[in-house]
Design a protein with these regions (language model features):
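Acidic, metal-coordinating catalytic cores used for nucleic-acid/nucleotide bond scission
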Residues: 226-234, 254-257
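Short amphipathic alpha-helical "interface-anchor" segments enriched in bulky aromatics
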Residues: 37, 83, 88, 335-369, ...
Length: 459
C-alpha cells in the first residue's frame, strides 16, 4: 500500500532531555539464546573443573572470570576496561549467574593467577566440545587445516613475546600460535602457543601428530585429510602423514628443490582446467628421499607481474603472464579435484579474519603469558560456541564439497550481534512471572523464537 508524504515525514526536531535511572533495562536481550546453550553444555561447571586445582578461593571464582571473558567477547568488546559500559546490565548478570560483575582490576588479577595447567585444561575442554559435535554430526570425512597467526603488541613487557618476521609491523614483539581448524564445521580444534621469533614449522610435528591421534581415537571411522602450506613441508612431515594413512596436500617451496624449475620449463603439454588454471602431475622424489610421491605442478594465468625480489635461473620459474605452484599429495583422485581441495584452504584465512575482527583473538590483554593464553582460549570458545549455537538450531545446508566448504551456512558473530544480541529489553514480573519484553520487530521475533523454540524441543 502506497503511503502519502504527510504520513511519512516528521517535523519533530526537538532534542529530548536525558535522564539516568536504575531500571531493569538491558541492552543485550538477545543473550537469552546463549542462556539455553550454556545450560545444555553445563559450561559453568566444566570451566570450574578447569581451575579446581588452584588453591586460591576468591569471591569471583576463576571459572566466572573465564565465563565473563567469553560473554565480553560475544558482545563485541575488546579491552578489559570496556566492561565498565555494561556492568549494570541485568541480562549479562543473569547469564553469568551473579548479582554484580567483577571490577576490571579483579579480572586482570585473576588472569595473572592462571597457570599453565588451567590453560591446558581449557584446551582439553575446547577439544572435547568439538569432538562431541563431530560425533553427533556423523561426518565420514574430516579435513584439518594447520597454519600460524601473528599477534603483535607495541609494548615490551608482555611475557613470552619476541621479535620475529612480521610483514605488517616490522620489529614489533609478537606471539605466533599454531592453529588446527576443522573445515566442515569452521571451528578451532586446538592451538599451540608460541613466541613470535619461531618458524612456522617450530613444534608443528608434535602438534599435528597429537591432533590427528586425538581425533582418530575419538572418531576411528572417519577418514582424515590434512592441508598445509609450504612452511610445513619436509620429508619427515610427508612421511609421517603417509605412514599414518592420512590423505594430505602440501605446498612445495621451489627453494628446496632446484629440479622443480627444470621440470616445469621442460614441460610442453599442460592439461587445461579453464582459462586460468592448467596443470600436470608426475611421480617423483628428491634425491635424498626414499619414496616417490605424486607431485602436482600448477600454472596460473595472471595479469599481475611478479613484484618480489627474484634470483633468475636458480629456483622459481619465470614466465610472463604465469605463476607456478607445486603440491605433493597421496590422494588418488583427479588433478582437478586435488587442486580444488587444496584451494579450499582459503576458508581458513576467512576464519582467522573473523576470529581477529569479531572475537578479538589477536588482542594481548595483560602482561602475563598465561593470562594472554586464557584470553586467546576464551576468544576461541566464544567463536566455537557461536558455531555450536547455529549447528544445534539449523539444518545442514550441503554435503561434502570438493573444497570442503562448511556443511552449514554460518552467520558471522558480528551479524548475530546486530540482528539478535544487541537488542534493548526490560525485565518485569507480571503476576510473579519473570518476563523479558522486547520491541515487536517481525524479523527479530522470527529469528529469536527460532533459536528459543529449538532449545525447548531439545529439552
Amino acid at each position: 500500500m502506497k503511503s502519502s508524504k504527510v504520513e511519512i515525514v516528521s517535523r519533530e526536531h526537538k532534542i529530548p532531555e536525558v535522564r539516568f535511572e536504575n531500571q531493569r533495562l538491558t541492552s543485550f536481550a538477545g543473550l537469552i539464546v546463549f542462556q539455553g546453550l550454556f545450560k545444555e553444555l553445563a559450561i559453568k561447571q566444566k570451566l570450574q573443573n578447569c581451575f579446581s586445582h588452584l588453591k586460591v578461593s576468591p569471591i569471583f571464582g576463576n571459572h566466572l572470570i573465564a565465563l565473563c571473558l567469553i560473554v565480553h567477547l560475544l558482545l563485541g568488546y575488546r579491552k578489559l576496561r570496556d566492561m565498565d559500559y555494561y556492568r549494570d546490565d541485568p541480562m549479562v548478570k543473569r547469564l553469568l549467574g551473579v548479582t554484580r560483575l567483577p571490577d576490571v582490576s579483579t579480572v586482570s588479577r585473576a588472569m595473572a593467577r592462571v597457570d599453565q595447567d588451567s590453560v591446558e585444561k581449557i584446551r582439553q575442554l575446547c577439544r572435547r566440545w568439538v569432538l562431541e559435535r563431530l560425533e553427533r554430526t556423523g561426518i565420514s570425512r574430516l579435513t584439518l587445516d594447520f597454519d600460524g597467526v601473528v599477534f603483535s603488541t607495541q609494548g615490551r613487557g608482555r611475557e613470552g613475546t619476541a621479535v620475529g618476521f612480521n610483514r605488517k609491523k616490522k620489529g614489533a614483539r609478537s606471539y605466533y600460535p599454531l592453529f588446527c581448524t576443522i573445515a566442515q564445521t569452521g571451528q578451532v580444534f586446538d592451538v599451540h602457543h608460541r613466541p613470535g621469533n619461531v618458524h612456522d614449522s617450530n613444534g608443528a610435528k608434535g602438534f599435528v601428530l597429537a591432533c590427528l591421534e586425538r581425533i582418530r581415537q575419538a572418531l576411528p571411522y572417519v577418514t582424515l585429510e590434512v592441508r598445509m602450506d609450504s612452511a610445513f613441508f619436509s620429508d619427515e612431515m610427508v612421511g609421517l602423514l603417509d605412514q599414518m594413512g592420512i590423505e594430505f596436500t602440501l605446498s612445495v617451496p621451489f627453494e628446496r628443490f632446484a629440479e622443480l624449475k627444470g621440470l616445469i620449463e621442460q614441460r610442453q603439454r599442460w592439461r587445461r582446467q579453464d582459462e586460468t588454471w592448467s596443470y600436470f602431475d608426475c611421480s617423483w622424489k628428491p634425491k635424498k628421499w626414499s619414496t616417490r610421491y605424486r607431485f602436482l605442478f600448477i600454472r596460473q594465468r595472471c595479469k599481475e607481474l611478479y613484484r618480489e625480489p627474484i634470483q633468475l635461473d636458480l629456483f622459481i620459474p619465470q614466465t610472463y603472464g604465469y605463476q607456478y605452484t607445486v603440491l605433493v599429495t597421496n590422494k588418488k583422485i583427479g588433478m582437478r579435484k586435488v587442486l580444488r581441495f587444496h584451494h579450499g584452504r582459503g576458508s581458513q584465512e576467512k576464519l582467522f579474519g573473523e576470529l581477529k575482527s569479531q572475537s578479538q583473538m589477536d588482542y594481548i590483554a595483560v602482561r602475563r603469558l598465561s593470562g594472554n593464553q586464557l584470553y586467546l582460549m576464551t576468544a576461541i570458545l566464544a567463536h566455537n560456541l557461536t558455531r555450536e549455537l547455529q549447528m544445534r538450531t539449523e539444518q545442514k545446508a550441503r554435503g561434502t564439497t570438493e573444497k570442503r566448504t562448511p556443511v552449514w551456512r554460518f552467520e558471522e558473530l558480528a551479524t548475530l550481534r546486530h540482528h539478535i544480541l544487541q537488542r534493548a529489553g526490560r525485565f518485569t514480573w507480571p503476576k510473579g512471572k519473570l518476563t523479558l519484553t522486547i520491541t515487536d520487530n517481525p524479523a527479530l521475533r522470527k529469528d529469536l523464537l527460532h533459536y528459543l523454540d529449538a532449545f525447548k524441543e531439545a529439552a
